[in-house]
């Protein structure tokens, strides 16, 4: 779906402000490509050393802000293919069940990383790019993608939002 949206974007749509504060649609697409690159070949991309996922996302986007839309689209095409292959390899035992820290997102079995990427894409396409490009906001709802997204949220929220969840509701 992302490749189809990216292929359909006009120059003005690539430059439009996205739903991610301070990022254009092109920056969101670059982030999506960079995430796949980080999974497939982490040694080839600088994401800083903050240990914070949001700060790590900004590093490659900032470094590539002057790229053309064609370069961003080509990077997404290349790295999404390699990233999906790497994620598929993480679904096989014993690797699938290996528990590792994922920056400030918590400690998770490697197989759930694919769910995190589905969540990331679901949100970025429909909400962030969708804020500027209506056809992205109305992409069909894929039950498998929704299942993977909810599974990631249920696995991640207790770790990512432990303080907020521990505080309980406001009285």
Locations of regions flagged by a protein language model:
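Alpha-helical scaffold segments in carbohydrate-active enzymes
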Residues: 27-38, 82, 121-124, 128, ...
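Short, helix-capping/interhelical loops that line the mouth of catalytic, cofactor-
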Residues: 35-89, 93-98
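Structured surface interface patches that mediate subunit assembly and partner/cofactor docking
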Residues: 16, 44-50, 89-171
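Short, structural beta-strand-to-alpha-helix junction motif
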Residues: 24-25, 68, 109-110
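Short alpha-helical functional segments enriched in proximate histidine and acidic residues
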Residues: 5, 35, 86, 124, ...
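An N-terminal domain-cap segment
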Residues: 1-30, 40
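Short, contiguous, pocket-lining structural segments
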Residues: 20, 71, 75-79, 113-117
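Charged/polar, solvent-exposed surface patches and flexible loops
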Residues: 4, 41, 74, 78, ...
């Amino acid at each position: 779906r992302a490749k189809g949206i990216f292929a359909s974007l006009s120059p003005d749509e690539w430059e439009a402000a996205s739903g991610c504060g301070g990022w254009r649609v092109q920056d969101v697409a670059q982030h999506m490509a960079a995430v796949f690159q980080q999974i497939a070949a982490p040694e080839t991309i600088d994401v800083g050393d903050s240990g914070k996922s949001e700060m790590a996302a900004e590093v490659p986007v900032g470094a590539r802000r002057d790229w053309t839309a064609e370069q961003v689209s080509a990077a997404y095409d290349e790295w999404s293919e390699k990233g999906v292959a790497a994620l598929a390899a993480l679904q096989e035992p014993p690797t699938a069940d290996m528990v590792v820290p994922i920056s400030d997102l918590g400690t998770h079995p490697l197989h759930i990383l694919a769910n995190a990427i589905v969540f990331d894409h679901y949100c970025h396409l429909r909400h962030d790019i969708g804020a500027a490009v209506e056809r992205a906001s109305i992409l069909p709802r894929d039950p498998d993608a929704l299942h993977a997204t909810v599974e990631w949220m249920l696995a991640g929220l207790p770790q990512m939002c432990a303080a907020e969840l521990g505080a309980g509701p406001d009285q």
